[in-house]
Amino acid sequence: MTLLKRILSVVLLALVIAVGGLYWLGTRDDASTGPAAVAADASTLVERGRYLALAGNCMACHTSRGGKALAGGTPIPTPFGTVYGPNITPDDKTGIGTWSADDFWQALHNGKSKDGSLLYPAFPYTEYTRVTRADADALYAYLRSVAPVSQPNRPPELDFPYDQRPLLAAWRALYFKPGVQEADASQSVQWNRGRYLVEGLGHCAACHTPRNRLGATRSSEPLTGGVIPVLDWYAPPLTNDMQTGMGRWTAADIAALLKTGISAHSSASGPMAEVVLGSTQHLTDDDALAIGVYIKSLPATPASLPRQSVAVAPAAMELGSKIYSQQCAQCHQPKGEGSGTAWPALAGNPTVTAASPVNAIRMVLDGGYAPATAANPRPHGMPPFGQILNDSDIAMLVSYIRNSWGNEAGGVTALEVKRARAASTLN
């Protein structure tokens, strides 16, 4: 055998071993998987599961607009194509009617379907793996109690090569490690509960942690914010940086936003408004506050997205000021001080001063309402201005707002507005 053949043989063997190792790592199950919990009271277990399903916002992905509850069909756009939320009602043919509690646990904890096939991580099992077996069994009991719906699942529509499901093994080997969240004995019960909800059932990292080019969350930059792929909304940092994060908020402020959709600092908009509407407003006061306590314990890490340094010309500031006076000052007040929670202050508003201006641009373009909640059933709304202001006007207006009354957030270009308009719900 020549030297070249020997080298090629060694390289080939190394590749086979590497691929085999990746496949093993990507398909392995958590060795700590335990037996199903025994329920003392079935009705109590179902009610607990109903609450957990709300806390985990299951409806958002498993109920299509205008469709039957939990029957699936919701399109979930990703940079790699579209996947559709499956039917998780107890229908035997199209849902999970034939699934056991162990099958359901395998999906939630190990990211595998009943037949052992690997699930796409649009289903956030990377976070749900932290959920306890007891909570998984409660969720299962609740899903078994809902009305079965016969609705076939729609297959994913992914680009090549992302449509090759076996490749998920390599992705999982790199980015997924199954394991239930262990309590930190050095922290309080309240802190541990908040951490469990944020990092596990609430899967906050799915939006609030930046992602790499393969769609995995960057574990080195947890909860430092990021633009939500395809939807083009910015999920701000949950860290305690004073300029870009939650540094100016209290735990009670965070709980108020989760429960009501509004706070002393800002109101929920875009995808977060939907989360409040369908999920967090239903949290108990204790759970909402526990989330706030945990978030306030996070370090003051700056936003992962670098703050823009677009200079704003004096002429643009002057024109932006005129547009603000004509269109905005009546509600938000001449100096951006706002008026209660109905018309939030723009001075110091984290939506305005965020590292990315996209949320502020989208609000001007589309307008919108804070979510209607039990504590705020008739939220005030903001009219859309995308039909009466052009891209240049909106760029100057948002630049003015981001750089007035103590705000120092950088300018906005007409090109950024054009891109946001393309993603606008009113386009």
Would you name each region that the model predicts?
Residues 1-33:
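N-terminal type II signal-anchor transmembrane helix
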Residues 40-75:
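Short extracytoplasmic
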Residues 60, 206, 330:
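Short, cysteine/histidine-rich loop/knuckle motifs that typically chelate Zn2+
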Residues 82-90, 233-239:
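Acidic/histidine-rich, surface-exposed loop or edge segments in extracytoplasmic proteins
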Residues 110-113, 260-264, 366:
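Glycine-rich, acidic and aromatic/proline-enriched surface loops and short helix-turn segments
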Residues 319-362:
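C-terminal structural cap/anchor segments
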Residues 25-36, 64-83, 114-195, 199-200, ...:
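Flexible coil segments in periplasmic/lumen-exposed cytochrome c-class electron-transfer proteins
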Residues 96-112, 116, 138, 247-251:
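Aromatic- and charge-enriched surface segment that lines or borders ligand/interaction sites
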